[in-house]
C-alpha cells in the first residue's frame, strides 16, 4: 500500500495510461480528503470539475434501493474504501484508480472483459446479501439511478436488469417504450 506520512498515494488511469497522481489524507474528523499532486498528461476526463467531484460521481447514489446496505457491507461507504474495493470502475468509460505502488493493470480490472460478481448483482437487485467476502469488482457500485438494478454478463453481451417502483413497476417498461419511439 502506498501510504506515506498518513497519506495514501493513488493514480488515476485511462486504461493503462497514467493521468493523475493524487493522494488521500484523513482530516481531524477521520474523513478522507483527496488532493491532486501532478497531472501526467494534458488530457482531462470530459466534464472534469476537480478530483473530489470526479470521484464522487463514479459512486452509485446512496438513495438507490439496496445500494447503501451493499456499500456498507463491502466497505465502500467511505470514499477511500470505495476506491480500494471498486477502483472507481464504471461501464461508462475506461477511467479507474489504483494505489500508486499497485501492479494492477487495466486487463485485470476492466468491467468490459472480466466476470461480474453474481452475489453482488443479486444483492443489488433484490437486497439479499448472502456472503460477506468480496472477491471481485462489480459495476453495481458505480451505476447511477434510483431503482434497484444489476448487470449481468451473458454470452451475447452485458445487460442491465432493472426493477421499478414497489407499486406499479412500470418504469423499466416506460424506458423500453421510449427507446423504441426514439428509433
Show which residues each predicted segment covers:
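Conserved, well-structured beta-alpha core segment at the onset of a catalytic domain
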Residues: 1-13, 172-179, 183
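P-loop NTPase switch module centered on the Walker A-proximal segment
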Residues: 2-130
